[in-house]
UniProtKB/Swiss-Prot annotation:
The keyword Nucleotide-binding applies. ATP 1 binds at G245, P246, P247, G248, C249, G250, K251, T252. The lineage of its organism: Eukaryota, Viridiplantae, Streptophyta, Embryophyta, Tracheophyta. The gene is ABCG49. Belongs to the ABC transporter superfamily. ABCG family. PDR (TC 3.A.1.205) subfamily. The chain crosses the membrane at residues 581-601, 619-639, 656-676, 699-719, 725-745, 811-831, 1226-1246, 1254-1274, 1311-1331, 1340-1360, 1368-1388, 1396-1416, 1449-1469. Gene3D superfamilies: P-loop containing nucleotide triphosphate hydrolases. ATP 2 binds at G922, V923, T924, G925, A926, G927, K928, T929. CDD domains: ABCG_PDR_domain2. This is ABC transporter G family member 49.
Amino acid sequence: MHTTTQATPQKSMVMTTTNGGGVDPPQWPEEEEDEDAAAGSSCRVTAANGHHHHHQQLVVSGELGGGGGGGGGGREKEDDELKRKWAAIERLPTADRLRLSLLSSTRGGGSSGDVSEGGGGGAASSELEVVDVRWLGAAERRAVVQRLVADVKHDHVRMLRKQRERMERVGVRPATVEVRWRDVCVEAECQVVSGKPLPTLWNAALSRFSLLAAKLGFSHHQSKVQILENVSGIIKPSRITLLLGPPGCGKTTLLKALAGRLNKSLKETGEIEYNGVKLDEFVPAKTSAYVSQYDLHVADMTVRETLDFSARFQGVGSRAEIMKAVIKREKEAGITPDPDIDAYMKAISMEGLQRSMQTDYIMKIMGLDKCADVKVGNAMRRGISGGEMKRLTTGEMIVGPCKVLLMDEISTGLDSSTTFQIVSCLQQLAHISEYTILVSLLQPAPETYDLFDDIIIMGEGKVVYHGPKNLIMTFFESCGFKCPERKGPADFLQEVLSKKDQQQYWSRSEQWYNFITVDQFCDKFKASQVGQSLAEDLSKLYEKSKANKNALSCSIYSLSKWHLLKACFDRELLLMKRNAFLHITKAVQLGLLAIITGTVFFRTHKNFDIVSANYYMGSLFYALILLMVNGIPELVMSISRLPVFYKHRDHYLYPGWAYAIPAFILKIPASLVAALSWTSISYYLIGYTPEAPRYFRQLLVLFLVHTGALSLYRCVGSYCQTIAVGPIAATMSLLVILLFGGFLIPRPSMPNWLKWGFWLSPLSYAEIGLTGNEFLAPRWLKITISGVTIGRRILIDRGLDFSVYFYWISVAALIGFILLYNIGFAIGLTIKQSPGASQAIISNDKIRICHGRDQEKSKDIKIGTRRMALPFTPLTISFQDVNYYVDTPPEMRKKGYMGRKLQLLRNITGAFQPGILSALMGVTGAGKTTLLDVLAGRKTGGVIEGDIRIGGYPKVQQTFSRISGYCEQNDVHSPQITVGESVAYSAWLRLPAEIDTKTRKEFVDEVLEIIELDEIRDALVGTPGVNGLSREQRKRLTIAVELVSNPSIVFMDEPTSGLDARAAAIAMRAVKNVAETGRTVVCTIHQPSIEIFEAFDELMLIKRGGELIYAGPLGQHSCKVIQYFQSIPGVPKIKDNYNPSTWMLEVTSTSMEAQLGVDFAQIYTGSSIRKDKDELIKGFSMPPPGTSDLHFPTRFPQKFLEQFKACLWKQFLSHWRTPSYNLVRIVFMAFSSIIFGVLYWQQGNIRHINDQQGLFTILGCMYGITIFTGINNSQSAMPFVAVERSVMYRERFAGMYSPWAYSFAQVAMEIPYVLMLALLFMLIAYPTIGYAWTAAKFCWFFYTMFCTLLYFVYFGMLIVSITPNLQVASIYASSFYMTQHLLSGFVMPPSQIPKWWIWLYYISPMSWTLNLLFTTQFGFEDNSNILVFGETKPIAAFVRDYFGFHRELLPLSAIILAAYPVLFAILYGYSISRFNFQKR
């Protein structure tokens, strides 16, 4: 009998360790393997390669071949067949049995996977075939998982029970882990400042000096803040525990502490043990899986690839050893297992597989199977939804073998039914597979809450309760608090700790209520029976004898070094393919520049004299700097991937060296292509020596230079870590390398005490290799007047006169630098902590609050006593037959969907009315956000059909943005301004001009108070996941920023997503108040509690596919919705106290539709509710009598000047508080000025210039100063502008300002900083280099530097505004820099530039910079003579004749130079008004 199964080309490593995890195996005879082999001599399984290496044929002979033909049926015959084939497998050696299994294959009726032909007649019949689980194809893996878990809700528990029963039948138990912790304290050290604790330039500078002072022994004001305070507890195997508490109470810190992942800057005391073993005695990161609340993934990888690589790196743990023990005992007992369970268990026990069946299983239970082949995406690139991203974050960690799961806020962005399903699966893993699970959730619905066994309540860094769920309400009742009947228990438990909410739950009406603090609750808990029981359990030592030796991991990595490296290679290769566009763009860019360069230097200089030699020298230097700059995009790409790398590294998926080696080796072909594309085009165009060996030697050096540049930028990125600092550090490194490289300043001209620097620059060796290769050729052997050859003369002048063999020394040195950079890269990846872990800054006031939490003064805000009283017009929004189409994604076309357009919304009809709070609900991916975007006019692509009316009149987008507010799901805010400033800024620009400043300020204060942001109004917003506000604070800020605009219509996309129950209640109270003022409020909502859901007046429910299935009133206690759906035959009735929103989503799910055989959309279309709604909408579609269409005299609420002032105010604050941008470029300018001053000490003095080389050297100085400080300013401006761009998109959609006002403010804000940078240079470098110390020349130099730095900054802003992301912007920017370099008049004087390129010289801003600098310094020196190319000339005449710089044209040159920053600023304003790269 023959079977053929699909196989991946990657073979796996099979573990053969004996006596394995979680088992107590009997003593097997040592010769058992030989007996197996002997017994199996009549039943042979061999692998024979077919015609294609992706297929493997298993040849099974002996008894397995019997019984293959014939018809017949009956269960007995099938069982006999199974036993006979299984018996044949049992005769094989253990190593073969571990990988072979029986899988069903349908013959005659089609099959999933390849099956052999023959037998069985024509009818379809299912037969078992022997397969090697290592080589299962994608279809076969999916088929196995589908058979085991066809319906997650019912089949998952059965599958786990089958696995458990199989193991129990042979006495094998899974490894279990108990986690306990005693008196754990965690504290952070903060630097204390006076006033607001903001990272301004001043505070940042003081912080650096204070840290330096501390290292030198001087004291500075530090304070300790307690995060966790004496917390103790136990989480046991087979139990799932819920962790609850308000934001900032220490939940995340506790989870990280238990997982052994606390930041090293935090001080931790106390004991944490796994099975009685302390954390430092094993590897907790490999024993437990910590699921972060932040979603960090590689945007270019698909969901399946992300999970496959995670599964591969995490390994199989003790599964292989457990499987080995199971099959041995089954053989001894004569047990035949279920084929599918056997195949699954064996497949997930195979180490190092490229594609894992565990991935298919995790995707199934997490609901990710439908988007398995979709790229993850990010904020600027379309990908999976936010809910799917959150599930992927969870799946990525639990796909591994860890039996301890520590999960932080895994339900954010998920609807309540999806959360319930995921937690159900986790509960089953705990109860059946004996996992130990601790989960932190924000707003668990009652039915999700009921799935947990134990509850931990935290407050202010302390444990308020830790014990069984069924005793927690008794505990709080003993404290005097009772949960109301229709209140979710989780909501009650979080609110009962809050000073503002506690009183409403006081149940002892006969006693006077007093606020009970967290400390009082803790004391009551310790005195309670549950608290005493916990203390008793903790006092008992864990019995290590009952612990399984394989329960804890003692190895840091799951794979061998070779397999780690290979897996990282596969991943890097995949990402290179996905980013092929970037690599192709870079190669094309180099090719085009090679053509331009070749035609600029095009064989016009065939005299082979000293002048031509200078041109050839210039072309070689240009090639070197071009290849160095061409690598800059590598820096941006490396830094952008670091957050994901740090996550994986901290989970011990792979080490830094395994990431660094593939990043280096796989870029070698890219460097080879770059060097080839340059050399092949430019070599003969420029006219280098036409000898093949010299061509290949030049190619080799340029290849090594490009490889070294990429390696250097990766190394710099690994230490600088952020996109703000990285480009500046890279430019600084490039500057040092070029200054000591021997071209800008020849080695003989360097100060003697700095000449050693020449030998530390890789560019020096590249120049030695290239120039020696060219100028030692026979054609340069003509003897000059000085008695040496022309080739030797040019080399001597440049200090590059070395013997021929130095070429190979140079090659060896370049290889050494490449290795050095890559070793540095690997070390940087290994030792550097992820960014965001810097020292915290805190104010004196905040310190006092933190040290006395319970004394914190708190105002009792009675929400609703003050109303948002500014005048507005109540408006109804109605819409009929709204459809929305997008282009079909490529992934769907690959799967066979042939339509060009994909419909996301289908004939949606409805209306939202003033004073009525409407909920828009549906499962994840139903189209809720899409509908809001369509109604709000936020879509940037796709086709919209249908009629949308505002107050009966057709919607006009410009007018609509004035009277509406949109709270987006993603909380996008400027990171460097405070909460209060964000809200004030929104009010300034969005409230009508007639509202005076005092009223506006009062309104802002009122909104901050209502949303409970007044206590953190001075807190910096910060960057999500790095610093600043927490997730729930950002969400409340998003709501406040929109409410402060006093809108008539408010759209809110997931206003409670990411909030805990109390924060969600605060937000919804505020939203309800807004609706009660007569405004129209619409919210999409995922997982509302009963209380939040029933706060709504009307509901619009959309099913997957964008079809409406209900639109109408909720009714008292949701009675109208319940009544409607229960009237549909077959729909199950709602249970008592069940959350109506969860029930509604469950009974309208796709699976329920299939089960009932109905279409809820069709039922709704034919219902009386729909007919009533249609009549209502008809009325709303007609303008009420006596009304007129909305009209505003101006497009924006404020006049242009006011918009400009507001934007300038915000830009001022952002610049002042971004030291990573401004402080770093100030430091760079100071560093550059010092190094130029030292290297060119007094070489600009006219008395020290004797020949043309002296002039060329000082021109190189001017060129180097301008190009490097310019590039640095441009590169550092790009990430700063990119961060603000996403905020600008939101503000522009809201109609806050004209793009011109925004751009002019951003442009204007750069001027004082650029003035400061230019002045800094003039004070340090100008006198040290020795330029003429006259007022006129000083002012001209200052003016030129200022304009140059300004146009470079504005160019950086412009290039970001016309490109989709920083990587592409970097590539285009590097093209600009290199074109400037080539045609600025430095590499080749304008008189020698061919006429077909001279126009580029005249439009190049750098050419005017050099013109002004050189002319003002040396163009008036008529009385100073120098020796130039063998003749004596006045400096002024040489400047005019050789460079074409005419002093008469100085005023014109100054005007043209000033025009460039103006031009770039205008183009920037135009670009941000025209281009939008946000895909919605």
